[in-house]
Amino acid sequence: MANQKLPTLKYTGKSESAVPIVSESELQTVTAEPWVKISDKGLQLEGLNFNREGQLFLLDVFEGNIFKVNPATKEVTTKFQSVKDNPAAIKVHKDGRLFICYLGDFKTTGGIFATTEKGEQIEEIISDLNTEYCIDDMVFDSKGGFYFTDFRGYSTQPLGGVYYVDPDFKTVTPIIQNISVANGIALSTDEKVLWVTETTTNRLHRIALEDDGVTIAPFGATIPYYFTGHEGPDSCCIDSNDNLYVAMYGQGRVLVFNKRGYPIGQILMPGRDDGKMLRTTHPQFIPGTNQLIICTNDIENHSEGGSMLYTVNGFAKGYESYQFQ
Protein backbone atom coordinates (compact mmCIF):
# COMPACT_ATOMS: atom_id res chain seq x y z
CA MET A 1 0.00 0.00 0.00
CA ALA A 2 1.41 3.39 -1.03
CA ASN A 3 2.50 5.74 1.72
CA GLN A 4 1.07 9.12 0.72
CA LYS A 5 3.31 10.94 3.23
CA LEU A 6 6.53 10.02 1.40
CA PRO A 7 8.20 12.51 -0.98
CA THR A 8 6.75 11.76 -4.42
CA LEU A 9 8.08 12.34 -7.91
CA LYS A 10 5.64 14.19 -10.16
CA TYR A 11 5.54 15.06 -13.86
CA THR A 12 6.17 18.79 -13.78
CA GLY A 13 8.29 21.17 -15.85
CA LYS A 14 10.76 19.40 -18.13
CA SER A 15 9.57 15.95 -17.07
CA GLU A 16 6.19 16.62 -18.71
CA SER A 17 7.81 16.76 -22.15
CA ALA A 18 7.99 13.69 -24.38
CA VAL A 19 11.51 14.83 -25.30
CA PRO A 20 12.83 16.98 -22.42
CA ILE A 21 15.73 19.34 -23.04
CA VAL A 22 18.08 19.32 -20.08
CA SER A 23 21.70 20.18 -20.85
CA GLU A 24 20.83 22.72 -23.59
CA SER A 25 17.89 24.36 -21.80
CA GLU A 26 19.71 27.70 -21.40
CA LEU A 27 20.62 28.06 -25.08
CA GLN A 28 19.06 30.72 -27.28
CA THR A 29 15.94 28.95 -28.55
CA VAL A 30 13.44 29.64 -31.35
CA THR A 31 10.47 27.65 -32.62
CA ALA A 32 10.22 26.96 -36.34
CA GLU A 33 7.20 27.89 -38.45
CA PRO A 34 5.46 25.70 -41.07
CA TRP A 35 6.72 26.33 -44.61
CA VAL A 36 5.56 23.55 -46.97
CA LYS A 37 3.64 20.34 -46.41
CA ILE A 38 5.13 17.59 -48.57
CA SER A 39 2.55 14.90 -47.83
CA ASP A 40 -0.30 13.96 -45.52
CA LYS A 41 1.53 10.66 -45.10
CA GLY A 42 4.39 10.15 -42.70
CA LEU A 43 7.34 10.06 -45.11
CA GLN A 44 10.96 9.80 -44.00
CA LEU A 45 12.05 13.07 -45.62
CA GLU A 46 15.77 13.68 -46.14
CA GLY A 47 18.42 15.15 -48.40
CA LEU A 48 17.52 18.83 -48.79
CA ASN A 49 19.69 20.46 -51.48
CA PHE A 50 19.23 23.41 -53.84
CA ASN A 51 20.28 23.60 -57.48
CA ARG A 52 21.82 26.65 -59.16
CA GLU A 53 18.35 27.96 -60.03
CA GLY A 54 17.29 27.89 -56.38
CA GLN A 55 14.96 24.92 -56.70
CA LEU A 56 14.88 22.57 -53.71
CA PHE A 57 15.33 18.82 -54.10
CA LEU A 58 14.61 16.29 -51.38
CA LEU A 59 13.55 12.66 -51.06
CA ASP A 60 11.77 10.17 -48.89
CA VAL A 61 13.93 7.28 -47.80
CA PHE A 62 11.57 4.33 -47.61
CA GLU A 63 9.46 4.91 -50.75
CA GLY A 64 12.29 6.40 -52.79
CA ASN A 65 10.46 9.39 -54.27
CA ILE A 66 12.52 12.40 -55.36
CA PHE A 67 10.65 15.69 -54.85
CA LYS A 68 11.23 19.22 -56.11
CA VAL A 69 9.91 22.31 -54.33
CA ASN A 70 9.65 25.74 -55.94
CA PRO A 71 10.40 28.16 -53.06
CA ALA A 72 8.58 31.02 -54.79
CA THR A 73 5.28 29.18 -55.28
CA LYS A 74 5.80 26.37 -52.73
CA GLU A 75 4.64 23.93 -55.39
CA VAL A 76 5.72 20.34 -54.72
CA THR A 77 6.26 17.92 -57.61
CA THR A 78 7.45 14.32 -57.66
CA LYS A 79 10.24 14.12 -60.25
CA PHE A 80 11.09 10.41 -60.26
CA GLN A 81 11.65 7.37 -58.07
CA SER A 82 15.11 6.19 -57.05
CA VAL A 83 16.45 3.20 -58.95
CA LYS A 84 18.16 2.07 -55.73
CA ASP A 85 16.67 1.12 -52.37
CA ASN A 86 16.46 3.56 -49.46
CA PRO A 87 17.98 6.75 -50.87
CA ALA A 88 19.21 8.98 -48.05
CA ALA A 89 20.75 12.17 -49.48
CA ILE A 90 20.88 14.37 -52.57
CA LYS A 91 23.80 16.61 -53.48
CA VAL A 92 23.79 18.76 -56.62
CA HIS A 93 26.95 18.72 -58.76
CA LYS A 94 28.21 21.87 -60.46
CA ASP A 95 27.14 20.37 -63.80
CA GLY A 96 23.54 20.07 -62.57
CA ARG A 97 23.45 16.33 -61.96
CA LEU A 98 21.95 14.94 -58.78
CA PHE A 99 24.25 12.68 -56.77
CA ILE A 100 22.06 10.37 -54.69
CA CYS A 101 23.37 8.36 -51.74
CA TYR A 102 21.48 5.18 -50.93
CA LEU A 103 21.50 2.80 -47.99
CA GLY A 104 20.49 -0.35 -49.87
CA ASP A 105 19.77 -3.16 -47.41
CA PHE A 106 21.28 -1.12 -44.52
CA LYS A 107 24.13 -3.64 -44.36
CA THR A 108 26.37 -3.96 -47.42
CA THR A 109 24.51 -2.81 -50.55
CA GLY A 110 24.65 0.97 -50.37
CA GLY A 111 26.25 3.31 -52.88
CA ILE A 112 25.98 6.55 -54.85
CA PHE A 113 24.57 7.15 -58.32
CA ALA A 114 24.33 10.30 -60.43
CA THR A 115 21.37 11.24 -62.59
CA THR A 116 19.64 14.18 -64.24
CA GLU A 117 16.90 16.16 -62.53
CA LYS A 118 14.43 13.96 -64.40
CA GLY A 119 16.00 10.71 -63.23
CA GLU A 120 17.61 9.92 -66.59
CA GLN A 121 21.16 8.87 -67.63
CA ILE A 122 21.98 6.89 -64.50
CA GLU A 123 25.70 6.61 -63.69
CA GLU A 124 27.10 4.50 -60.86
CA ILE A 125 29.60 6.54 -58.82
CA ILE A 126 30.09 4.13 -55.91
CA SER A 127 28.73 0.72 -56.89
CA ASP A 128 26.77 -1.45 -54.48
CA LEU A 129 28.11 -4.49 -56.34
CA ASN A 130 31.81 -3.84 -55.78
CA THR A 131 31.79 -2.38 -52.25
CA GLU A 132 30.26 -3.02 -48.83
CA TYR A 133 29.43 0.56 -47.90
CA CYS A 134 26.06 1.70 -46.61
CA ILE A 135 26.22 5.33 -47.75
CA ASP A 136 24.10 7.89 -45.94
CA ASP A 137 25.42 11.33 -46.89
CA MET A 138 28.13 13.18 -48.80
CA VAL A 139 29.61 16.65 -49.27
CA PHE A 140 31.55 18.01 -52.26
CA ASP A 141 34.78 19.97 -51.93
CA SER A 142 35.75 22.78 -54.33
CA LYS A 143 37.77 20.38 -56.51
CA GLY A 144 34.74 18.23 -57.30
CA GLY A 145 35.75 15.34 -55.08
CA PHE A 146 33.58 14.42 -52.12
CA TYR A 147 33.50 12.93 -48.64
CA PHE A 148 30.87 10.35 -47.71
CA THR A 149 29.66 8.61 -44.56
CA ASP A 150 29.36 4.85 -44.15
CA PHE A 151 26.23 4.21 -42.08
CA ARG A 152 27.05 0.67 -40.94
CA GLY A 153 27.21 -0.76 -37.44
CA TYR A 154 25.49 0.00 -34.17
CA SER A 155 26.49 1.28 -30.72
CA THR A 156 28.80 -1.62 -29.83
CA GLN A 157 29.84 -2.54 -33.38
CA PRO A 158 31.48 0.50 -35.01
CA LEU A 159 31.69 -0.59 -38.65
CA GLY A 160 31.15 2.82 -40.25
CA GLY A 161 33.50 5.58 -41.25
CA VAL A 162 34.22 8.55 -43.49
CA TYR A 163 35.88 8.34 -46.91
CA TYR A 164 37.08 10.71 -49.62
CA VAL A 165 36.51 10.15 -53.34
CA ASP A 166 38.84 11.94 -55.78
CA PRO A 167 37.33 14.24 -58.45
CA ASP A 168 37.76 11.51 -61.09
CA PHE A 169 35.66 9.18 -58.86
CA LYS A 170 38.28 6.42 -59.17
CA THR A 171 40.10 6.52 -55.82
CA VAL A 172 38.48 6.08 -52.40
CA THR A 173 40.59 7.08 -49.39
CA PRO A 174 39.58 6.37 -45.77
CA ILE A 175 39.61 9.45 -43.52
CA ILE A 176 38.40 8.06 -40.21
CA GLN A 177 37.03 4.62 -39.40
CA ASN A 178 35.51 2.60 -36.55
CA ILE A 179 32.51 4.91 -36.25
CA SER A 180 29.11 3.66 -35.16
CA VAL A 181 26.61 4.70 -37.87
CA ALA A 182 28.36 7.71 -39.42
CA ASN A 183 25.54 9.95 -40.59
CA GLY A 184 25.63 13.69 -41.31
CA ILE A 185 28.67 15.38 -42.84
CA ALA A 186 29.66 19.00 -43.52
CA LEU A 187 32.82 20.77 -44.66
CA SER A 188 33.96 24.15 -43.32
CA THR A 189 34.15 27.17 -45.60
CA ASP A 190 37.96 26.89 -45.84
CA GLU A 191 37.72 23.10 -46.31
CA LYS A 192 40.05 22.51 -43.37
CA VAL A 193 37.47 21.04 -40.97
CA LEU A 194 35.16 18.10 -41.54
CA TRP A 195 32.15 17.67 -39.27
CA VAL A 196 30.59 14.21 -38.84
CA THR A 197 27.68 13.04 -36.69
CA GLU A 198 27.77 9.57 -35.16
CA THR A 199 24.16 8.68 -34.52
CA THR A 200 24.00 5.61 -32.31
CA THR A 201 26.70 6.82 -29.91
CA ASN A 202 25.41 10.41 -29.86
CA ARG A 203 28.70 12.08 -30.80
CA LEU A 204 29.87 15.02 -32.91
CA HIS A 205 33.27 14.63 -34.59
CA ARG A 206 35.44 17.60 -35.60
CA ILE A 207 38.21 16.50 -37.97
CA ALA A 208 40.96 19.00 -38.84
CA LEU A 209 42.49 18.22 -42.24
CA GLU A 210 45.85 19.01 -43.77
CA ASP A 211 46.12 20.66 -47.19
CA ASP A 212 45.75 17.38 -49.10
CA GLY A 213 42.22 17.02 -47.72
CA VAL A 214 42.70 13.42 -46.62
CA THR A 215 45.36 13.52 -43.90
CA ILE A 216 44.17 14.32 -40.39
CA ALA A 217 46.22 17.09 -38.78
CA PRO A 218 48.19 16.16 -35.64
CA PHE A 219 45.68 15.84 -32.77
CA GLY A 220 43.07 16.98 -35.29
CA ALA A 221 40.38 14.36 -34.70
CA THR A 222 38.31 15.35 -31.68
CA ILE A 223 34.82 14.87 -30.25
CA PRO A 224 33.74 18.32 -29.05
CA TYR A 225 30.20 17.33 -28.12
CA TYR A 226 28.23 14.41 -26.71
CA PHE A 227 24.50 14.55 -27.31
CA THR A 228 21.83 13.17 -25.01
CA GLY A 229 18.53 11.39 -25.54
CA HIS A 230 16.98 9.19 -28.19
CA GLU A 231 17.71 8.86 -31.09
CA GLY A 232 20.67 11.03 -32.03
CA PRO A 233 22.34 13.49 -34.41
CA ASP A 234 21.42 13.26 -38.09
CA SER A 235 22.23 15.41 -41.14
CA CYS A 236 23.93 18.78 -40.82
CA CYS A 237 24.91 21.92 -42.74
CA ILE A 238 26.97 25.08 -42.20
CA ASP A 239 26.31 28.78 -42.61
CA SER A 240 28.72 31.42 -43.94
CA ASN A 241 30.06 32.04 -40.41
CA ASP A 242 31.00 28.36 -40.11
CA ASN A 243 28.26 27.63 -37.59
CA LEU A 244 27.07 24.04 -37.79
CA TYR A 245 23.35 23.11 -37.76
CA VAL A 246 22.66 19.52 -36.66
CA ALA A 247 19.23 17.89 -36.95
CA MET A 248 18.35 15.77 -33.92
CA TYR A 249 16.47 12.71 -35.14
CA GLY A 250 13.70 11.60 -32.79
CA GLN A 251 13.89 14.86 -30.84
CA GLY A 252 12.12 17.40 -33.05
CA ARG A 253 14.87 20.00 -32.98
CA VAL A 254 18.09 21.32 -34.54
CA LEU A 255 21.15 22.18 -32.44
CA VAL A 256 23.55 24.90 -33.61
CA PHE A 257 27.30 24.92 -32.87
CA ASN A 258 29.97 27.53 -33.50
CA LYS A 259 33.08 26.68 -35.48
CA ARG A 260 34.81 25.32 -32.38
CA GLY A 261 32.00 22.93 -31.55
CA TYR A 262 30.30 24.85 -28.74
CA PRO A 263 26.47 24.83 -28.74
CA ILE A 264 25.09 28.35 -29.27
CA GLY A 265 21.43 27.87 -30.16
CA GLN A 266 18.60 25.51 -30.97
CA ILE A 267 15.50 25.36 -33.15
CA LEU A 268 12.41 23.49 -31.96
CA MET A 269 9.63 21.90 -33.98
CA PRO A 270 6.11 22.92 -32.89
CA GLY A 271 4.42 20.23 -30.79
CA ARG A 272 7.60 18.35 -29.92
CA ASP A 273 6.81 18.32 -26.19
CA ASP A 274 3.64 16.40 -27.06
CA GLY A 275 5.57 13.90 -29.16
CA LYS A 276 4.76 15.50 -32.53
CA MET A 277 7.06 16.00 -35.53
CA LEU A 278 10.02 14.35 -33.81
CA ARG A 279 11.81 12.86 -36.82
CA THR A 280 13.87 15.92 -37.68
CA THR A 281 16.44 14.86 -40.27
CA HIS A 282 17.99 17.66 -42.33
CA PRO A 283 18.53 21.45 -42.24
CA GLN A 284 19.47 23.48 -45.34
CA PHE A 285 19.63 27.20 -46.19
CA ILE A 286 17.83 28.85 -49.08
CA PRO A 287 20.73 30.12 -51.25
CA GLY A 288 21.76 33.72 -50.62
CA THR A 289 19.67 34.05 -47.45
CA ASN A 290 19.75 33.21 -43.76
CA GLN A 291 16.43 31.35 -44.09
CA LEU A 292 16.84 27.77 -42.93
CA ILE A 293 14.57 24.95 -44.10
CA ILE A 294 14.17 21.85 -41.91
CA CYS A 295 12.47 18.60 -42.87
CA THR A 296 10.66 16.37 -40.41
CA ASN A 297 7.74 13.95 -40.17
CA ASP A 298 5.13 12.75 -37.71
CA ILE A 299 5.58 8.99 -38.04
CA GLU A 300 6.06 8.57 -34.28
CA ASN A 301 2.68 10.27 -33.74
CA HIS A 302 0.81 7.88 -36.10
CA SER A 303 1.63 10.29 -38.97
CA GLU A 304 -1.07 12.69 -37.77
CA GLY A 305 0.82 15.74 -39.02
CA GLY A 306 2.16 14.15 -42.20
CA SER A 307 5.55 15.23 -43.57
CA MET A 308 6.60 18.86 -43.36
CA LEU A 309 9.20 21.46 -44.11
CA TYR A 310 9.61 24.10 -41.38
CA THR A 311 11.56 27.34 -41.47
CA VAL A 312 13.41 29.89 -39.31
CA ASN A 313 16.20 32.42 -39.81
CA GLY A 314 19.66 31.22 -38.82
CA PHE A 315 22.58 33.15 -37.34
CA ALA A 316 24.00 34.01 -40.79
CA LYS A 317 23.48 33.41 -44.48
CA GLY A 318 23.95 29.88 -45.70
CA TYR A 319 27.27 28.93 -47.24
CA GLU A 320 27.01 28.52 -51.01
CA SER A 321 28.79 25.25 -51.62
CA TYR A 322 30.17 23.44 -54.66
CA GLN A 323 27.19 23.67 -57.02
CA PHE A 324 27.24 27.49 -56.83
CA GLN A 325 31.00 28.00 -57.20
Curated annotation (Swiss-Prot):
Q: Which GO terms describe its cellular component?
A: cytoplasm
Q: What biological function has been recorded for the protein in this entry? A: Exhibits lactonase activity. Acts in cells with perturbed membrane integrity and is possibly related to the membrane homeostasis.
Note the Pfam families from the entry: SGL
Would you tell me the protein name for this molecule? Lactonase drp35
EC no. given is 3.1.1.-
Q: Where in the cell is it found?
A: Cytoplasm
Q: Where does Ca(2+) 2 bind?
A: T108, G110, D128, T131, Y133
What terms describe the molecular function in GO for this protein? Answer: hydrolase activity; metal ion binding
Active-site residues, Swiss-Prot/TrEMBL: D234 (proton donor)
Family annotation (InterPro entries): 6-blade_b-propeller_TolB-like, SGL, SMP-30/CGR1_Lactonase
Task: List ligand-binding residues for Ca(2+) 1.
Answer: E46, D136, N183, D234, S235
Q: Where does it primarily localize?
A: cytoplasm
How, per the record, is the cofactor bound?
Binds 2 Ca(2+) ions per subunit.
Family according to the record: Belongs to the SMP-30/CGR1 family.
What PANTHER family does the database record attribute to this sequence?
LACTONASE DRP35, LIPOPROTEIN-RELATED
- Is Cell division among the key words of this record? no
Known cofactor(s): Ca(2+)
